[in-house]
From Swiss-Prot:
Substrates-to-products reaction catalysed: (8S)-3',8-cyclo-7,8-dihydroguanosine 5'-triphosphate = cyclic pyranopterin phosphate + diphosphate
Listed pathway(s): Cofactor biosynthesis; molybdopterin biosynthesis
Active-site residues (renumbered): 129
GO BP field: Mo-molybdopterin cofactor biosynthetic process
Protein known as: Cyclic pyranopterin monophosphate synthase
UniProt family annotation: Belongs to the MoaC family.
Function description: Catalyzes the conversion of (8S)-3',8-cyclo-7,8-dihydroguanosine 5'-triphosphate to cyclic pyranopterin monophosphate (cPMP).
First-tier enzyme category under EC: lyase
Keywords: Lyase, Molybdenum cofactor biosynthesis
Transmembrane segments: none
Species in which this protein is naturally found: Listeria monocytogenes serovar 1/2a (strain ATCC BAA-679 / EGD-e)
This protein's encoding gene: moaC
Length: 160
């Protein structure tokens, strides 16, 4: 795509929301991932339920789902969409890294990549917020789109 072909600019080179009126509704799915690194003790306390603010993973899961539904309120040119599925899962390395994965699905005229990315980002920020009293050095890294399906551009899978 050429610079002049960017779709979020009008004829005056000012920002606009893309017109999706004539696009067909199709099933669209996106998976995103983010990893938060922390001290071993922090991860152990999360799993043991010994964080003062509560069940970290349950709260982060709900925060991620809420974020997916609110993405258009945070990202200026994102269309409001009807999210038909939003799920957050967690996997850790048993030491210091906790990976957050989101899956977001819709049947609509525009994709859900931003919703999936927003979901993992907010889930990671929620974990940071709930654990920062004991570990201010946590790092949120490697936030990326893992896969997307549906729509005119078809399927995308990130390189491993």
């Amino acid at each position: 795509m050429e610079k002049d072909d960017l779709t979020h600019f009008n004829d005056e080179k000012r920002a606009k929301m893309v017109d999706v009126t004539s696009k067909s509704e199709t099933k669209r799915r996106a998976i995103a991932s983010a990893t938060i690194h922390m001290n071993e003790e922090t991860l152990a306390r999360i799993h043991a339920g010994k964080i003062a603010k509560g069940d970290v993973l349950a709260v982060a899961q709900v925060a991620g789902i809420m974020a997916a539904k609110k993405t258009s309120e945070l990202i200026p040119m994102c269309h409001p969409i009807m999210t038909t599925k939003a799920d957050i899962s967690f996997e850790d390395d048993g030491k210091t890294a906790l990976t957050i994965t989101s899956e977001v699905v819709t049947v609509g005229k525009t994709g859900v990549e931003m919703e999936a990315l927003t979901a993992v980002t907010i889930a990671a920020l929620t974990i940071y917020d709930m654990c920062k009293a004991m570990d201010k050095g946590m790092r949120i890294e490697k936030t990326y789109l893992v896969e997307k399906t549906g729509g005119k551009s078809g399927t995308f899978k990130a390189e491993a």
